[in-house]
Regions:
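Bacterial N-terminal signal peptides that target proteins for export
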Residues: 1-7
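PEST-like low-complexity, intrinsically disordered acidic/proline/serine-rich tracts
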Residues: 6, 12-328
Length: 328
């Protein structure tokens, strides 16, 4: 039987099988079964920086400088295959540093060390958690299994920094984003249709998009509050609103930002920012994701006493603010 410390370590380090696809940093290789085709030389990307804060500052300055290609209805054309270069799913405040990932395998990943915070606001790169939420975050990491171990959906914004690649499809009335992670997809309505009923709570919420010049602004509500934003137990409730901004900086670069606003958990909204880059591998395509096949992680984690995360609703918060950390 593992000690409590061992259980916590297991919760941090045990990854679902599909995460292996993201462990070998080969451009255009979305999964173990994929065989990459010939790859063009990597193009330069506007505002490219290892520091998310510097990238985000530059992206704001250049947001209107590029004349993006247009769709038939005159909107910026984001269609194509895209990827990110962040390990924020591990820890928003200190993601693993991709620059140090020179070899394949989990041992090399563990050696990589922390990178710079993906949080670009507040400027200190820290989560503005309320005191009770700091306690809850530590308890989440120690007691609960990340939703991805069960192949559950990741929620927004984590959907945008999970393993694998993305495909963006545009139509006049909507934008669809397909993810290799768990066969997930989002359909973002841009035609002004009304929102779904407030009592409907979904893993990826209810998204509505609008255009502000060349920037696609997406506001997502109605999430179910059952996801972690990273594998360190960062969370929000079902009352959260997430506002994303997609801005094309050049033909091969999108500046992506997401502001999380949940006044039940945080003292103020916070914003993450990073770069999406276009896949340039010839013949690249989204492949089927092997998620649960052969997955022993959940069995192991349950055997050492960890639990499935129950989520936190707005109705739960008053009691959680006054309870002791182990009373759930």
């Amino acid at each position: 039987m593992l000690s409590v410390a061992g259980a916590v370590a297991a919760a941090v380090l045990v990854l679902p099988p599909r995460a292996v696809a993201d462990q070998v940093p080969q451009v255009g290789t979305p999964g173990a079964a994929a065989t990459p085709g010939p790859q063009a030389s990597e193009p330069e990307h506007s505002c490219a920086s290892d520091d998310p804060a510097l990238f985000w500052r530059c992206a704001q300055e250049k947001a209107t400088a590029f004349e993006a290609p247009r769709t038939a209805d005159g909107r910026p054309d984001f269609s194509g295959y895209w990827r990110h270069g962040t390990e924020a799913k591990e820890d928003l405040e200190a993601p693993w540093d991709n620059r140090a990932r020179v070899g394949a395998g989990r041992e090399r990943e563990r050696d990589a060390g922390p990178g710079k915070s993906l949080i670009v606001d507040p400027p200190d790169g820290k989560l503005p958690l309320q005191p009770w939420a700091e306690v809850q975050k530590r308890e989440n990491e120690a007691r609960y299994i990340d939703q991805n171990t069960h192949c559950f959906l990741s929620g927004v914004p984590r959907f945008m920094y999970e393993a694998g690649a993305y495909q963006i499809l545009q139509a006049p009335e909507s934008i669809t984003i397909l993810s290799e992670e768990a066969h997930a997809f989002r359909v973002i309505a841009t035609d002004g249709r009304p929102r779904i009923a407030k009592n409907l709570r979904l893993w990826l919420g209810d998204a509505r998009g609008r255009w502000e010049g060349n920037t696609l602004v997406v506001e997502t509500t109605n999430q179910n509050g059952r996801v972690f934003l990273d594998r360190r137990g960062t969370f929000y409730t079902d009352a959260a609103t997430v506002t994303e901004r997609f801005t094309m900086l050049d033909q091969n670069t999108i500046a992506y930002g997401a502001t999380v606003d949940d006044p039940l958990v945080y003292t103020r909204p916070f914003t993450i920012g990073f770069m999406l880059t276009r896949h340039t591998t010839k013949g690249f395509e989204i492949l089927e994701d092997s998620c649960f096949e052969g997955n022993k992680d959940a069995e192991i984690l349950y055997s050492i006493g960890l639990k499935k995360y129950p989520g936190i609703t707005s109705e739960d918060v008053p009691a959680l603010k006054v309870r002791t950390p182990t009373s759930r």
